[in-house]
Amino acid sequence: PIANSINQLNLINKLNMKKKFNRGIAVHFDTGMSRLGLDESETNQFLINKIKYNSIKIDLVMSHLACGDQAKHSMNTKQLDKFRIIRKHFPNSKASLANSAGIFINKKYHFDLVRPGIALYGGSPFLNSKINFHHVVNLKAKVIQIRKIKKNDTVGYGATFKAKKNMYIGTIAVGYADGFNRKFSNNM
């Protein structure tokens, strides 16, 4: 599990003291993304009172780059500096800062392990990438029916599409029954 707040660390600490939880965890520190992790106040509170949490085995300390897709963005250096300070408090724990974009910025962001997200699936974390990423999967489906509909006819679950004019529509052989989320209806 990954602890993202003091409340979660307190809960894990209580469970450990009652011998109900006894595995290593990761602690996520927010160094600038303002999304997940202990914020600056919680980080300071945790580090000052670290001895209180000595029942917790911390296998990994981590953070997430907010601007990794912009290699020269000053935020990357700010986050790296903050993360290095935090990491010094956990010399026996592995550390991770680099997300997909961070992998390609510079090795100094790698620490002990990297966390490829979109890159794992062949997606580029960069808007204008010179790196030749290859998607690992493609969705292909055959058109199994073509039909003519009239203006104001509706189509699909929830009648989410309404024809603005007489038109032809095609139905492909993939959908809800195949695990394809309905939110993609009329959005392909």
What are these regions (language model features)?
Residues P1, V27, I172-V174:
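Preference for bulky hydrophobic residues occupying beta-strand positions
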Residues P1-L9:
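Catalytic beta/alpha-barrel core
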Residues N7, M17, S185-N187:
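Proteins with a high burden of low-complexity, intrinsically disordered sequence enriched in S/T/G/P/A and R
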Residues L9-G24, F29-K142, I149-K150:
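Active-site loop/helix belt of alpha/beta enzymes
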Residues K140-N187:
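Functionally critical, mid-to-C-terminal surface segments that flank or help form catalytic/ligand
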